[in-house]
């Protein structure tokens, strides 16, 4: 029996069709695109996915987190999934940058964890911090490190008690003490997300992720819930019918060119929603809208407190 799928969209070139003009005036391009996606009821926009594919990434582009930061301001409901890799970016930088964008978007940001970033490679074929090969296992280490850092400073510790003068209950801030793949003491210098953890997408091998992205037609294995990517515009209708009947498929990810985006959003998406193949746009954080529970791990309850010897019970206002 078919079930309603969540809807993600990747726009080739992130919607930048005239690279010289659009990179010089990105605000118009991003605002326009975000508005169109929201009106169409798209659940989330994946920004920068092509960076993970050799031969697909263009020579001129804006950083996905920069686009997402602007899109957060220009949108109210649309989820923003940022593509990034533990390649030239250290997990600490990834964790801080992603959580900062999520704060700007009030809990609407996710992460597509890439193995390799062709947009920032600059001839680097390994992790520029550790020298590790850029494999799926390496990405799993980066995902674990980022998740751990997100949990070192829980958002709930920010109490903002004016009467007592306590800003943060610092006894809840934990060390990361990451030793596998990376050596990171932590904690992160930004509080965690209202989502708990940001949702994470990974290609095929979903170790450590909330959702696995597979290509339409590829075999579906067990493990994390699956999002199926459809690249051919002419087969979207048939693909949605088929994907909605895959037991582990929870969503579809449409990669479209700017030239056909209008037709897909104005004709294909409403028709599929009318047939019950796509769900109605939800409310709340991105994690809540996608029905994703917060992972149980990593558990930092046994990690050392950062401020064990602090003289006061919390950061002062």
What are these regions (language model features)?
Residues 57-81, 141, 222, 266-280:
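Alpha-helix-loop-beta-strand connector modules within alpha/beta enzyme cores
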Residues 229-275, 279:
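Substrate-recognition/cap regions that form aromatic- and gly/pro-loop-enriched pockets
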Residues 8-28, 83-92, 115, 128-130, ...:
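Active-site mouth loops of central-metabolism enzymes
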Residues 1-2, 35-39, 68-76, 98-108, ...:
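Acidic (Asp/Glu)-rich catalytic clusters
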Residues 1-74, 197-198, 204, 209-211, ...:
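N-terminal beta1-alpha1-beta2 module of alpha/beta enzyme domains
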Residues 5, 10-23, 91-172, 247-251, ...:
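Flexible, glycine-rich active-site loops centered on histidine and acidic residues
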Residues 132-143, 148, 152, 275-317:
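Extended, intrinsically disordered, low-complexity segments
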Residues 3-11, 45-47, 78-84, 107-114, ...:
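Hydrophobic faces of well-ordered beta-strands that scaffold small-molecule active sites
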């Amino acid at each position: 029996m078919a079930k309603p799928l969540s809807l993600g969209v990747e726009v080739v070139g992130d919607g930048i069709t005239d690279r010289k003009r659009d990179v010089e005036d990105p605000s118009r391009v991003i605002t326009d695109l975000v508005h169109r996606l929201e009106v169409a009821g798209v659940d989330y926009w994946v920004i920068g996915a092509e960076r993970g594919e050799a031969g697909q990434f263009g020579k001129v582009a804006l950083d996905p987190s920069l686009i997402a930061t602007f899109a957060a301001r220009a949108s109210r409901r649309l989820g923003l999934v940022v593509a990034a890799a533990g390649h030239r970016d250290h997990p600490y930088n990834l964790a801080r940058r992603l959580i900062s964008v999520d704060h700007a978007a009030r809990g609407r940001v996710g992460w597509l964890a890439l193995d390799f970033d062709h947009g920032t490679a600059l001839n680097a074929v390994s992790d520029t911090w550790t020298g590790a090969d850029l494999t799926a296992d390496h990405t799993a280490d980066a995902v674990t490190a980022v998740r751990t850092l997100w949990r070192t400073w829980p958002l709930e510790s920010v109490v903002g008690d004016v009467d007592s003068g306590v800003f943060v209950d610092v006894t809840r801030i934990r060390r990361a003490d990451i030793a596998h793949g990376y050596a990171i003491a932590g904690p992160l210098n930004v509080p965690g997300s209202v989502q708990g953890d940001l949702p994470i997408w990974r290609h095929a091998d979903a170790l450590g992720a909330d959702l696995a992205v597979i290509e339409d037609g590829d075999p579906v294995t067990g493990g994390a819930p699956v999002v199926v990517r459809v690249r051919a515009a002419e087969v979207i209708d048939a693909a949605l019918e088929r994907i909605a009947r895959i037991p582990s498929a929870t969503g579809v990810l449409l990669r479209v060119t700017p030239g056909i985006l209008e037709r897909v959003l104005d004709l294909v998406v409403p028709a599929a929603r009318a047939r019950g193949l796509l769900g109605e746009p939800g409310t709340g954080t991105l994690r809540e809208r996608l029905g994703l529970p917060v992972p149980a791990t990593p558990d930092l309850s046994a990690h050392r407190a950062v401020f064990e010897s602090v003289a006061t019970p919390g950061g002062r206002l």
